[in-house]
Amino acid sequence: MGEIAPEMEISQYTKDKASCTRISIESYYSKRVTQCAERENRLKKLEEDISARGLSDEEKEEKRKIHHSKETDYLRLKRTRLTVNDFESLKVIGRGAFGEVRLVQKHDTGHIYAMKILRKSEMVEKEQTAHVRAERDILSEADCDWVVKMYYSFQDYSNLYLVMEFLPGGDMMTLLIKKDTLTEEATQFYIAEAALAIQFIHSLGFIHRDIKPDNLLLDARGHVKLSDFGLCTGLKKFHRTDHYRNWPSTLPPDFISKPFESKRKAETWKRNRRAYAYSTVGTPDYIAPEVFQPNGYTKSCDWWSLGVIMYEMLIGYPPFCSELPQETYRKVINWQQTLVFPSDVPISIEAKATIKRFCCEAERRLGNHGGLDEIKQCPFVKRIDWNHIRERPPPIRVTVKSIDDTSNFDDFPDEDLTWPTSTLIRPEEQPGRRGEFVDFTYKRFDGLTQKMRYSDLKKFQQAKKNKKGGQQGTSD
């Protein structure tokens, strides 16, 4: 009788390869089902559009031929591998703890995008892989005017790339820094649009958890779009709140009694605001108190954040802002004592009542039980035309001079616009080889079939030519 062979010890490398293979196979079949459903939906929308227009048989057939041609192009283009060399880097428009955002132009279509570039090594080291995966998954699923649209996602050995629509209006943080405070009419408009965006995310089954002015982007007309979904629920680790949990939450005896003039407080807040936006930890100003607690939270935490933003729009700074994030954290935890309204910045009774209904206990918070329908009944926003708000002109006009206008963004002077030399890294040195970034690639149907209007492309090319000519003339 032969001896039983001892069990072979499986190496970590083999386990990682097996895990990646399993994820790839599962993803492949899941994507096949999803793509089939999406194709059927596009055909259904086409037929509905054809029926609504009352076209002749010849016109209907022509529409169907164009659609089938697009579907064929889409299948072919999906097989092509995207790299950074398919884009021209124009300008750095944002920088964060883990990467940067660039204004780019796609070579074959001439279309302008905002490209978020994230370093894989930083993602793995700082345990942010689940966050970027969440953002990629939600942006690929979301197809709505209230959410920033992602057209492509891809990766190379060093970096992850999210290619999104460029929104030249900037963000709400920049607008608030410029304007100090907003009128109640303007506040009603922006709070209503933000509420519609939040409700859409909730309808997908997600909680955003990071609602703040930085993440409320403005399109070319000045309408709101929600962005940055890296902290949506479904994740087991919430990096930012973990950072605060070891801090003391009790207030010193004289903590609230210190007088602080509103104008001076607003100036201090503005001075520190951008530094918070670009830091790893950020600021706890907009985070609901229950998110810091171990007992859990619900989607109502997003409505708390909206109440804090509303306060900032009307008063000029968030209700719990302090010189140090530790102090802000203590104020948020003890909101019953620290949520006060300054006497030198008068606001209406309706506005104050709405803020108090957003910033209160989770179980009785505005929006907690009835969602958007409950918020619509609030006196402060009852005059809003909710069904047609996106067709209406925003209260504050956004100035956009060209398709690549970045005047509503911060300047990042003397930045190197060359692409990272990621291809020099060998595959075996690739960060995150245990399946973190498997199946990261995404291509949107209307992104692959759209072209820039010829007139816009010619204007853009002429503007670039003039700019280069001016720079050469200066150097001569």
UniProtKB/Swiss-Prot annotation:
Residue ranges occupied by any Protein kinase domain in the UniProt entry: 87-381
InterPro entries: AGC-kinase_C, Kinase-like_dom_sf, Pkinase_C, Prot_kinase_dom, Protein_kinase_ATP_BS, Rho-assoc_Ser/Thr_Kinase, Ser/Thr_kinase_AS
A Pfam family annotated for this UniProt entry: Pkinase
GO biological process terms on file: cell projection assembly; establishment or maintenance of cell polarity; intracellular signal transduction; negative regulation of cell growth; neuron projection development; regulation of cell shape
Keyword annotations of the record: ATP-binding, Cytoplasm, Developmental protein, Kinase, Magnesium, Metal-binding, Neurogenesis, Nucleotide-binding, Nucleus, Phosphoprotein, Serine/threonine-protein kinase, Transferase
Family: Belongs to the protein kinase superfamily. AGC Ser/Thr protein kinase family.
The protein's name in its UniProt record: Serine/threonine-protein kinase sax-1
Protein source organism: Caenorhabditis elegans
